[in-house]
């Protein structure tokens, strides 16, 4: 089966989700069609056709012009290749895939990932463009796939046809995201979480400029690591995490490590407390090293500008490594968290987050190991790439008949 994998732009890292299924389904003949790609991971050995490489130029006028010119070229390239199925990731920038499917009569599968499913998100030209692409994808897709039940409900509210919409959890490779080979070192005993009154605002007790930019693993194995992996943005809640961690650091010593980049990176580097370490973007192997080193991974994604977290694959990656997670109860996040083993925080405030992190750091080594094993087992059984691939294979076979 020839499958055209289409996406507006392809950046790997970090967007491994766009190619994970293709790499796990070698029985299909894959070709990626995109406006522009930047793939620095040599393991992503897929043929890629770029319709407008200059789209990644930082100059906005050049980027916009080449994007417009590249849409038709991308559509024609997909049609000329003659695929059996076209699979578009994200409704935004789906016009070439929709057009190619229409003119060639090929079935179109569209995976919705987040903001592309919302009926009204922002204003201006960007919002109008998103709406145009979303309508085209909803009308032209043979099957619409949402990465969580939450996002499927968002899509239904935006006008998606329920008869063509289903949930397809992306899954993570549990043969790659695995616990550390060596046993986790024992730690000093920490008391149970303290009970203390909540302040009006959690203070950040640090002078500006203390955030350390360092990607190396810590030598002090006894100091527990609280880890964040993702975009350093308000949507991902990294500001809440730093505030919560700072309030806890004196009474519950730990190191907060932030892996990634984003709009809040500069501010965090300038003002983060001394126990916070920023690594910047890292290769996937280095991310896994940090995940395995962590005692708990925290993803406090919160509603921002009308949208919420659709899934949160980093939660699955961490739990596949046997590391429990702490997350805000928002959007599709609860669907990615092992029931009874990881922690969901209903109150989305730095104070509530601090209490949840405190609870996680108080777990004994035995309890941590038990929770980690439960996390690993749940992800392997319910959210593995293996299961996701099996479902996708069935979908392809159904639409290609």
Where are these regions (language model features)?
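Nucleotide-activated donor-binding/catalytic signature segment of Leloir-type glycosyltransferases, i.e.
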Residues: 266-288, 296
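Conserved acidic donor-binding segment of nucleotide-sugar-dependent glycosyltransferases
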Residues: 339-351, 359-365
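Acidic donor-binding loop of glycosyltransferase active sites
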Residues: 292-307, 323
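Short His-centered aromatic/hydrophobic patch
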Residues: 88-93, 112
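N-terminal subdomain of nucleotide-sugar transferases
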Residues: 1-47, 246
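Carbohydrate-associated surface elements
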Residues: 150, 171
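Nucleotide-sugar donor phosphate/pyrophosphate-binding loop at the beta->alpha transition
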Residues: 67-70, 107-109, 117-137
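Conserved donor-binding/catalytic core segment of Leloir-type glycosyltransferases
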Residues: 4, 145, 185-201, 205-209, ...
